[in-house]
Amino acid sequence: MVGIALLGAGIFAREQHLPAIESVGHLNLKAVYSRSEEAAISLAKQARDRVDIYFDSPPTSGRSLDDLLARSDIAAVAACATILVQPLLIRKALRAGKHVLSEKPIAQDTATAMGLVQWYSSQSSPPIWAVAENFRFNESLRYAEMRTQEIGGELASFRLTYYGLIRKENKYFKTEWRKTPEFQGGFLLDSGIHFIASLRLLLRAVGQEPKEVMALSSLLKEHLHPVDTIHAVVSTIDSRHGTVCISFGVEHISTLEIEIISTRGVIVWTPVSVTSIIKSDSGESMNEKKEFIYNNGVKAEFEAFCQAILQNSPDPRQSPLEALRDLALLQSLLGSAACDGSMKLVKFE
């Protein structure tokens, strides 16, 4: 069994991390931590079994985060705090010798993320640090990746589209740190990073990575500042071009969709379906559609993290470097838009 602690008591920690931890047979939840005692107690009450609580306010002997990290029966932590707090928790836990599963995005910007990755890489035999990008564990996306590899061919073009609306009454918007974001991009960073990670996964399936971007952004709903919409042209390392259109500020709601067009066929992915159009050697097209029951992949990513610890072998889908590359692409989009569509390189090292 792997003793684990949950750091953070927000919505996603309560509704996703806690049940995921409790569903993985080799994980044993030992403790929870939040900055406030009240939040820590509230989270602990939701746990299936009794867990210890730790907090920093009010200061209480034996109940701080440092006290939690000093426990020898806790081998790992799941860090699910606000975007600006995450880097501090990651460093602190790794320095204490704990394996870490930290929520996406890896950090608020690439400078902070690169600093973390470089520091981690310089450590001698460090604990496992995994970044929780749960979309990489979505069953339909994994199937789309497999089909893209099977179809093969060279990339011709690609498309990512999502249109939706984050309303003022949305439970995630109601959190103070999202109402007044002190990080770039607002919901485009907080939620859009999932879409970017999914696009990169499918581009990698045809041997491509984004290289350059040109983007424009807008703010359609004032409460979603600084920006809620981005439209971009993205070029890959082999000079293939595609588009990225993401908005959290439009009433019209469309499903998330990624289309990969190669010289051998087309893959269209949504979270609940994968459509394959395969061009045969004779020139005929064969269509196939496979449907899925939606699963956000959170349980699967905790299972992968647990196995990584037990086998002492990090899962590449949770690599901090992959998370850094996700962030680098998104930051390049935002940076280009801030410069009225000027071309930006996707820098991640």
Swiss-Prot record:
Q: Name the Enzyme Commission number(s) assigned to this protein.
A: 1.1.1.-
From the UniProt record, give one GO term of the biological process aspect: NADPH regeneration
User: What keywords sit in the KW lines?
Assistant: NAD, NADP, Oxidoreductase
Q: Does the keyword Hydrolase apply?
A: no
According to the record, what induces this protein's expression? Answer: Expression is induced in the presence of 6mM glutamine.
Q: Which class of enzymes does this protein belong to?
A: oxidoreductase
Any one Gene Ontology molecular-function term assigned to this protein's record: nucleotide binding
Q: Which InterPro entries match?
A: Gfo/Idh/MocA-like_OxRdtase_C, Gfo/Idh/MocA-like_OxRdtase_N, NAD(P)-bd_dom_sf
Gene Ontology CC: cytoplasm
Q: Tell me, what's a Pfam family for it? A: GFO_IDH_MocA_C
Keyword S-adenosyl-L-methionine present in the record's keywords: the answer is no
**Pathway, according to UniProt?**
Secondary metabolite biosynthesis
Similarity comment: Belongs to the Gfo/Idh/MocA family.
Q: What does this protein do?
A: Dehydrogenase; part of the gene cluster that mediates the biosynthesis of the gamma-pyrones fusapyrone (FPY) and deoxyfusapyrone (dFPY). FPY is an undecaketide and thus likely synthesized by the polyketide synthase FPY1 from acetyl-CoA functioning as starter unit and the addition of 10 malonyl-CoA extender units by successive Claisen-condensations.
* UniProt protein name: Dehydrogenase FPY6
Lineage here is: Eukaryota, Fungi, Dikarya, Ascomycota, Pezizomycotina
